[in-house]
């Protein structure tokens, strides 16, 4: 049953929490219809809705504030109990000026199996909880009057589906939290001509001062595709091509005398972005226009160092699970995301490792603008099977392609701490699976580093990422000061965990400590790593000692501190769940800058 909430609470949720922004700044169209807001909602624990015709005759009594899941306060429901099937319903009308165009229904994310009906007609389904997807609903809509949109989301507690930090038990445990069911990112409509731009993959090359555009279009032979590149409002390049096939590739020289250095690079210190507009014309009429942007930056590895724009970069990252108290995995607003980014930078970190969450694209957009580095990490499965392999691989490839153009993303992390591959140390099948994901990732993105198993038991990784929650700085330093015993698998670095899986060895990759710290203040409930501290002075002493120990290791090229905020029962954040600083931000910065 739905938790009873009074009208005042529901109205407050709808008024306070709204997602009105265009959901994908990397591929923005000016004309769109936001479907966020109040929908009708129902639980279907007995899975009887399809049999009983709910899709054709929706009669749901409860309101829900989309895109917030029923588990959140922001939804207006706020019930943590797991429900395997949930239904949504709302109406929409086609604007008069859009009649005659294709009607595309888009979901930025919905967890886990999403089924869609329009006016009682089944449209299709999507499997996966993190990637965006869409349906062409043109043939099912009425051009005048109201259209009925019905959505069913099916979730489970299966460990074969990528679930990240969502619990698979009825209660929270360890570092796993309340599940995330159904629509959790923006839903919207776009109205497009049959001739349209489907996608553009943008690959910068700072060594040749050029950028490669991989276009995917639906166009006839008499169409023309224009690309206009500008920087800070000044046009840098413009060119046109005649599409002679659905997929085309063009490389463009970006050197321009309009700019002081002829080309502007993207970096944390100077996050320069080029704006780009793509226009598709049919018979000299603009039939589609998309706005995007890109950053000229390069990520590479040489001599045990990660290079950004051909220069070594020491990464000081913060583990960020992307949870909010009242909205959980759904960011409450642009302002909330920007607050996290600005506080991260204010503490002297230059990036985040988005842990077990594929983040909202508007967060990535803000990182692109602010110069905050991002490691993008897949949500884990927790058992190994053919089904898990298929689920994981499909969704990971979707996410890589969806997030490829963001310059702030500099590392891909498909696996963490052997989750989903629990016997990887010796199991050849599990080892081979991680290798296959590595090479598939490289086939889509040859440049960015891929960390196959963040924490331990690496197979093939471009960065050797190790986790260690030792709370005494001197002990931490002594463990790592001579790198060979750990990197040659002579000794484990984390209890019984070794750096490499059996049969694999160190090849000179960069080494980073990618989880450490996790210090919690004394708390009557919840947990952190190691002994809890009572005062700011105790916290800073430990933080300084363990951070300085890592920075004193000449072969270690960076670190990831756990973590930015408290998350439910895990209370080891530098900020509380409501983003109140536990320690003065400048004092954390002083240690990071030291």
Protein language model features and the residues they cover:
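Substrate-binding/catalytic cleft of secreted carbohydrate-active enzymes
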Residues: 341, 351-579, 587
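Secreted/periplasmic carbohydrate-active enzymes, especially glycoside hydrolases
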Residues: 1-354, 366, 374, 395, ...
């Amino acid at each position: 049953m739905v938790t009873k909430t009074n009208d005042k609470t529901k109205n407050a949720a709808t008024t306070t929490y709204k997602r009105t922004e265009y959901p994908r700044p990397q591929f923005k169209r000016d004309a769109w219809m936001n479907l966020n807001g109040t929908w009708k909602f129902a639980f279907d624990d007995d899975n009887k809705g399809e049999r009983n015709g709910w899709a054709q005759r929706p009669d749901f009594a409860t309101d829900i504030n989309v895109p917030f899941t029923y588990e959140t306060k922001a939804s207006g429901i706020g019930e943590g109990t797991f429900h395997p099937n949930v239904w949504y319903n709302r109406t929409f009308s086609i604007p008069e000026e859009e009649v005659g165009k294709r009607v595309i229904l888009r979901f930025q994310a919905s967890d886990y199996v999403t089924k869609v009906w329009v006016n009682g007609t089944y449209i299709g389904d999507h499997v996966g909880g993190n990637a965006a997807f869409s349906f062409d609903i043109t043939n099912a809509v009425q051009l005048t009057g109201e259209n009925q949109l019905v959505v069913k989301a099916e979730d489970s507690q299966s460990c074969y589906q990528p679930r990240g930090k969502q619990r698979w038990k009825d209660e929270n445990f360890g570092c796993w939290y309340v599940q995330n069911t159904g629509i959790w990112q923006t839903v919207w409509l776009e109205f497009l001509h049959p001739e349209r731009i489907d996608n553009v993959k943008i690959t910068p090359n700072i060594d040749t001062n050029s950028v490669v555009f991989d276009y995917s279009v639906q166009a006839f032979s008499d169409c023309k595709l224009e690309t206009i590149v500008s920087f800070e409002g000044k046009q840098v390049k413009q060119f046109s091509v005649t599409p002679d096939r659905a997929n085309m590739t063009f490389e463009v020289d970006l050197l321009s005398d309009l700019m002081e250095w002829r080309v502007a690079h993207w970096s944390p210190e100077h996050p320069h972005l080029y704006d780009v507009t793509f226009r598709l014309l049919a018979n000299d009429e603009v039939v589609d226009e998309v706005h995007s942007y890109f950053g000229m930056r390069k990520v590479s590895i040489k001599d045990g160092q990660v290079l950004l724009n051909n220069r070594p970069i020491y990464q000081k990252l913060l583990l960020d699970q992307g949870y909010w108290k009242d909205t959980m995995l759904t960011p409450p607003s642009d302002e909330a995301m920007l607050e996290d980014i600005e506080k991260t930078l204010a503490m002297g970190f230059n990036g985040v490792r988005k842990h077990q969450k594929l983040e909202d694209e508007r967060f990535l957009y803000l990182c692109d603008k602010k110069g905050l580095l991002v490691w993008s990490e897949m949500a884990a499965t927790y058992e190994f099977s053919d089904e898990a392999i298929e689920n994981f691989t499909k969704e990971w490839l979707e996410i890589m392609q969806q997030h490829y153009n963001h310059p702030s993303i500099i590392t891909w992390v498909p696996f963490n701490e052997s989750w989903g591959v629990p016997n990887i140390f010796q199991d050849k099948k599990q080892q081979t699976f991680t290798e296959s994901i590595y090479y598939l990732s490289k086939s889509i993105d040859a440049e960015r580093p891929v960390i196959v198993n963040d924490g331990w038991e690496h197979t093939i990784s471009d960065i050797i990422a190790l986790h260690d929650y030792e709370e005494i700085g001197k002990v931490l330093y002594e463990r790592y000061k001579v790198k060979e015993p750990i990197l040659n698998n002579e000794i484990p670095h984390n209890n019984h965990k070794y750096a490499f899986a059996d049969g694999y060895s160190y090849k000179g990759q960069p080494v980073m400590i990618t989880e450490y710290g996790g210090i919690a203040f004394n708390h009557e409930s919840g947990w952190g790593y190691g002994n809890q501290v009572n005062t700011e002075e105790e916290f800073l002493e430990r933080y300084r000692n363990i951070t300085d120990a890592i920075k004193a290791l000449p072969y270690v090229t960076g670190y990831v501190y756990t973590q930015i905020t408290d998350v439910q029962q895990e209370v080891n954040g530098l900020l509380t769940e409501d983003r109140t600083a536990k320690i003065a931000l400048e004092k954390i910065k002083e240690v990071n800058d030291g």
